[in-house]
Curated annotation (Swiss-Prot):
Protein name: Olfactory receptor 2V2
Bilayer topology term: Multi-pass membrane protein
Topological domain spans for side Cytoplasmic: 51-58, 122-140, 221-237, 294-315
Gene: OR2V2
Gene Ontology MF, one: olfactory receptor activity
Species this protein is from: Homo sapiens
GO BP annotations listed: detection of chemical stimulus involved in sensory perception of smell
Length: 315
């Protein structure tokens, strides 16, 4: 047994992690790092393409660039520290580092959830009111949508970080997770945190179910509009417009609701760790692939970029 188990740690916490040093876990760690690399490169590339190509300077792609920025920050919040601890054999994280992880994680997950909900409204306007789309989704509205998503997430993250980090923590301070996940951290508090946990649950309900209700309402209206279309080509275009967003929504909300909206007696640390890997690493990797591989405009921008690089290298 490692020496840190028999010591108390007053300046920070110990992260028990998700991987041991068995052969199977080494393979899984390699897979997670490969996924992390793809997520990093994919989101950076998508942001770059949207910024560089004038044809992608539309509301939908502006929202997509913000989503990619959130995903990029999300994978960089927890995975590098997890990898550093695993490779070095150290399991510690400083008190300040733990607080930063909590604040960033809550902020980014909350902001992304709200943005995905408001992106559904954008799809609704594009399909149900195409003639009024440039007016209803002008630059000011787009900035308000993304700004409100970031603002709600930042406020939520700051409040929860300050409250959680002001609780007294006892004993060995071993967090049964691969990052400073708030609910795992609260189990180590020396005081009763049940009231705050109820507040967290209420925040999760708002930050997840409120945008999810916008998504359901938007797609209900979209479905009504699509059913009234008589052209097969119009059907295909409408479904293609929505399919990428629906896939991203299913991945993100499925994992987030599984963790944060389950009754407490159904929670298991091992399940939470796997679900956290899913939407902190896998979803950020899949989002740029979903939105680019199934989108002609993004693929066209990528081909033009590659052609420019090839021509430049020949000269």
């Amino acid at each position: 047994m490692e020496t840190w188990v028999n010591q108390s740690y007053t300046d920070g916490f110990f992260l028990l992690g998700i991987f041991s040093h068995s052969t199977a876990d080494l393979v899984l760690f390699s897979v997670v790092m490969a996924v992390f690399t793809v997520a990093l490169c994919g989101n950076v590339l998508l942001i770059f393409l949207i910024y560089m190509d004038p044809h992608l300077h539309t509301p939908m792609y502006f929202f997509l660039s913000q989503l990619s920025l959130m995903d990029l920050m999300l994978v960089c919040t927890n995975v590098p520290k997890m990898a550093a601890n695993f490779l070095s054999g150290r399991k510690s994280i400083s008190f300040v580092g733990c607080g930063i992880q909590i604040g960033l994680f809550v902020c980014l997950v909350g902001s992304e959830g709200l943005l995905l909900g408001l992106m559904a409204y954008d799809r609704y306007v594009a399909i149900s009111h195409p003639l009024h789309y440039p007016i209803l989704m002008n630059q000011r509205v787009c900035l308000q949508i993304t700004g409100s998503s970031w603002a709600f997430g930042i406020i939520d993250g700051l409040i929860q970080m300050v409250v959680v980090m002001n609780f007294p923590y006892c004993g060995l301070r071993k967090v049964n997770h691969f990052f400073c996940e708030m609910l795992s951290l609260l189990k180590l508090a020396c005081v009763d945190t049940s009231l705050f946990e109820k507040v967290i649950f209420a925040c999760c309900v708002f930050m997840l179910l409120f945008p999810f209700s916008i998504i359901v309402a938007s797609y209900a209206h979209i479905l009504g509009t699509v059913l009234q279309m008589h052209s097969a080509q119009a059907w295909k275009k409408a479904l293609a417009t929505c399919s990428s967003h629906l896939t991203a929504v299913t991945l993100f909300y499925g994992a987030a609701m599984f963790i944060y909206l389950r009754p407490r007696h159904y929670r298991a640390p091992s399940h939470d760790k796997v679900a956290s890997i899913f939407y902190t690493v896998l979803t950020p990797m899949l989002n740029p692939l979903i939105y680019s591989l199934r989108n002609r405009e993004v693929m066209g921008a990528l081909r033009k970029g590659l052609d420019r690089c090839r021509i430049g290298s020949q000269h």
